[in-house]
């Protein structure tokens, strides 16, 4: 009987550690992009209290993110909006907690003949992060202008680090970039100009002033089921940290440099352009519903074939 109890306790501890990590470490899978900045502030302030340590696992492509989710390498993740819907529709138990990044994407070019989407005909376009929000919106906008990939233009995909190096080296004339990388490239090479602001383009096609949802924080479903109060606390503290980031661009720049090796000055300059605005998942269903309907009508594969149901959203 004692052996059975000992075995049961060992299995329980192993299961608990597989979900929460040793010594109650909370892992957040995120790219070096706007959604990670509030997490840095949470680490700095020990936002979840003395019982929890927060650590970041960096992903640099949706493929790496998906592998991290499948392997349960973290409990919380920064998700591009199309990716979390795809994973959910494939049967993975994930929950969307919030949307925190809106817009943030631009078409930039150093080709003087490129002044609109239509001018990309016959040209090569570098796109950051295949299957991400920027990728989905890029193809949606180009399709609206009557341009099809391969037939009318060539798309080349790269992760964030790769595309920065390619563009900075002058090996690309046209690129889809996100902040803070756009600010960094424009500072390094004044020949590049912003041709299309994605939020303005989205508003043009929708006929209103709605923001364009780009990324949010999500959580493994089993974590939300096991400890909903922890997830609720994380969401609340993330919202506070995001507001601090917006109000303290210089300080978050220093923190991003210290923790992730990001350029402090570029972060400082780009914070106002990052589209940082916290909206809890329970309050964003209508906005995302409209987005999903548009993408479903355009290309169902972008969101995994169907509009996710209510169980995608964390409602605490």
Language-model-derived ranges and their functions:
Residues 24-147, 154-157, 173, 179, ...:
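Short, glycine-/small- and polar/acidic-enriched structural segments
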Residues 289, 293-316:
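Conserved C-terminal helix/tail region of periplasmic/extracytoplasmic solute-binding proteins
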Residues 1-8:
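Bacterial N-terminal signal peptides that target proteins for export
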